[in-house]
A protein has these predicted regions:
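Active-site core of metal-dependent hydrolases
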Residues: 30-143
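Short linear, low-complexity motifs centered on an aromatic residue
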Residues: 96-113, 131, 229, 236-238, ...
Length: 729
């Protein structure tokens, strides 16, 4: 084992970029090559079936089962032309990954042979075993039946030889067991609520679409080095490891030249992603060494979520091909930035109006203010719930550190919009207003044209920032399913818009002019949601004190934050918006607490194993070597001179002894804390026990191990060090 680290380091240095064959046509020509999109539908489906299916996708009408067989036949024909032999219902259970079971296109022909078959029934509905997925007690082990049902709004795609059909996943009794079902409900409710409010300004609007543009951050680690780090393999993060002397302090990695091997990986990934219809746009180095980002063009929210889940799976496949492992954990390395997934969220009407963008007329700008303020109302009322939606055992490592948004939800608007809302709040009732357009900025450099400066700056410490025509939810974790946070955001804003319309209509019913009524309610809401607006430094201690005074949720314990899902206001909001029932919320919380416990439990077990089987043996081996050196020196030089010459080694021997003893006691205490926690029956209380008693002991052990790493001879240390993991590319 002593030489394994050096073997894998040498192996990593030998690796060269994998050659990637670039398609000989433009990206636009192979985009969505393996997606059953509208062009394929038009080609492979009868015209009447095509029209009905498009109506389902565009207008949300119920799928007519009578066309299912024709759709399935067209899909099968297209799939077989692409070498497909199997199909699967592809869904997103509460594991935060995806799930699939592959079935072949074969049935008995009744004559002792087989025929290829794929019916509408198989396309529309399947029955996976629901008892083996996280369900929070909704299903007992002996109650295995669950249903997966086709989501026609997200196109079918091909991976290898399998036709993948995006589906929802529900229990036998109808409760959602996935992320997609409540996401679709939230999108439907938000569209209805936003459309009703739009009718004050644009009577012809029929629906409002929610758009999402995510920014996926990730780390790449050489596969050889990864294989020599059991903690990375089993938990997704390093449980020990001293900082590299150089990490990100020079700011030289962000937007730097992309390393050759990484560039080959990115190129391969983008080609395959484009073929699957994922509109990749941007790639670059991130702040930390070996950290990178990929971002697509924004899409309709449901499709964007599916594409993000598909991309994370694809990244792992492509990374392996290039001799890398992709790390999606929010904090794989201590001492350098973790990874997030900014969610750029916006609303757009079917007539092309961006509802969070300012317009050119007073009417447009009043609409703009209404949607800004009602979004803030939803975020303010449910700020604790929004925090719960992005909280996890992994993301908790990142939030609140001086690298990511704090664990207090607030919204940054920028000076101009803040001044505007303050002006409306204090202005005379009938005063009209208009927002200025972008202002030019002369750079005094002849070769550079005038820049058009946005009316909003950026505040990287803000979890929910307005960025010109959208809001950027920055607290979402890198390995999370975006749907978790968007379900809450969509439902909260839908509720706010519904409440807004109810109050405006009440004033109109009393005889007040529509514009006057809208301004009255907007001014009232500007005052109400003012505590959520914060343009300062979210990292400061002063903000934590101020947030408490404002009544914002400042709880930092992950298991306790999950309680927000079961607050009366949350249950009522989800019920009113028809997004989730109380039983679904309770079940999901059970899953969240159980998942939190299991992740910390696994980390604790891995740490105990590595400590006793790697760290302690290596440290004591080095200690013994030093002891022999001391003994030999004293024999050669005699008493006083020998003691003087060996004083440094004796000091190291003593420090190793003290630290290993502390570590061994720490591991024993860690095991005992786990035993106590494991006896707790309540999933909530067990998760809290793991948070309060188990996780802190791991940090104490890590501190001692990282100190030992600096003491023990480099040639003996068996685990690849941070400098190797972060700088070998």
């Amino acid at each position: 084992m002593a030489n394994l680290r050096f073997e894998v380091v040498a192996e990593a240095f030998k690796k060269r970029p994998v050659e990637v064959e670039t398609p000989k046509v433009r990206p636009s020509e192979y985009f969505a090559k393996y997606v059953f999109n509208r062009q394929k539908m038009y080609k492979y489906l009868p015209s009447d079936v095509y029209e009905k299916l498009v109506d389902v996708i565009d207008n949300g009408t119920r799928l007519d089962r009578s066309i299912a067989d024709a759709v399935a036949a067209g899909m099968k024909l297209w799939a077989e032309e692409n070498g497909v032999t199997h199909y699967t219902h592809w869904f997103q259970p509460l594991t935060e990954g995806t799930a699939e079971k592959h079935d072949a296109f074969v049935e008995h022909d009744g004559k002792g042979g087989m025929i290829e078959e794929f019916s509408g029934k198989l396309l529309v509905q399947q029955e996976p075993d629901a008892s083996s997925f996280p369900n929070g007690g909704i299903r007992n082990t002996f109650e295995a039946r669950g249903y997966s049902a086709w989501d026609p709004t997200s196109p079918v795609f091909i991976i290898d030889d399998t036709l993948c059909i995006p589906t929802i996943f529900i229990s036998y009794t109808g409760e959602a067991l996935d992320y997609k079902a409540p996401l679709l409900r939230s999108l439907h409710t938000l569209s209805e609520a936003a459309t009703e409010v739009c009718h004050y300004f644009y009577p012809l609007v029929k629906k409002v679409q929610t758009n999402l543009g995510w920014e996926q951050e990730y780390f790449l680690v050489d596969e050889s080095l990864y294989s020599a780090r059991p903690d990375l393999m089993l938990t997704g993060r390093t449980l020990m490891g001293h900082d590299s002397a150089k990490n990100q302090q020079m700011d030289d990695h962000y937007f730097g030249t992309i390393p050759e091997r990484v560039q080959a990986f990115m190129k391969d990934l983008e080609i395959q992603a484009l073929e699957l219809g994922i509109p990749c746009k941007t790639r670059h180095n991130e702040v930390a060494p070996n950290q990178f980002e990929l971002a697509p063009i924004y899409e309709e929210c449901n499709l964007a979520v599916d594409h993000n889940m598909l991309l994370m799976s694809l990244m792992k496949r492509v990374a392996h091909k290039h001799g890398f492992r992709v790390l999606l954990h929010e904090k794989p390395f201590a001492g350098v930035n973790g990874s997030g997934k900014h969610n750029n969220w916006s609303l757009c009407t079917d007539t092309g109006v961006l509802l969070h963008a300012a317009g050119k007329t007073p009417e447009d700008n009043l609409r703009f203010v209404v949607f800004i303020v009602e979004t803030l109302m939803g975020v303010y009322k449910h700020n604790g719930l929004l925090k719960a939606s992005i909280m996890s055992a992994t993301n908790a490592h990142r939030l609140g550190a001086n690298e990511a948004p704090p664990a207090i939800i607030s919204s940054f608007l920028g000076k101009q919009l803040t001044d505007l809302l303050d002006h409306i709040e204090k202005a005379d009732k009938d005063e009209l207003f208009a927002l200025a357009g972008k202002k030019g900025m002369e750079l005094d450099i002849p070769e550079i044209p005038e820049l058009m400066i946005d009316n909003t700056d950026r505040n990287r410490t803000s979890p929910f920032a307005f960025t010109g025509n959208r809001f950027e939810f920055r607290a979402v974790g890198s390995e999370a399913n975006c749907a978790s946070s968007l379900i809450v955001l969509n439902a909260a804003v839908a509720e706010a818009l519904e409440n807004f319309k109810t109050r405006v209509d009440a004033l109109i019913a009393k005889g007040e002019d529509q514009t006057s009524a809208i301004i009255d309610i907007v001014r009232e809401d500007i005052k109400t949601c003012k505590p959520i607006r914060f343009d300062g430094n979210g990292y400061s201690d002063e903000w934590k004190e101020e947030a408490l005074k404002r009544g914002l949720d400042c709880e930092a314990s992950c298991p306790v934050v999950f309680d927000r899902y079961l607050d009366k206001e949350s249950i009522e909001m989800f019920a009113k918006t028809n997004v989730m029932s109380e039983s679904e919320l309770k079940a999901r919380n059970e899953v969240k607490w159980e998942t939190y416990t299991k992740k910390i439990q696994i980390e604790a077990r891995v740490m105990g194993d590595l400590t006793m089987n790697h760290i302690i043996p290596v440290a004591t081996h080095y200690q013994s070597r030093l002891a022999k050196n001391v003994e030999g020196m004293i024999n050669i030089f005699g008493g006083e001179e020998g003691k003087k010459l060996t004083a440094r080694n004796v000091k190291i021997i003593r420090e190793i002894a003290e630290r290993t003893e502390t570590i061994e006691r720490g591991v024993e205490a860690l095991v005992n804390a786990r035993k106590v926690a494991n006896k707790i029956e309540s999933e909530r209380e067990k998760a809290i026990a793991y948070h309060d008693t188990v996780a802190p002991k791991m940090e104490e052990i890590r501190y001692q191990i990282d100190k030992l790493e600096l003491l023990v001879a480099d040639e003996l240390w068996t685990l690849p060090k941070y400098r190797e993991l972060l700088f070998i590319r």
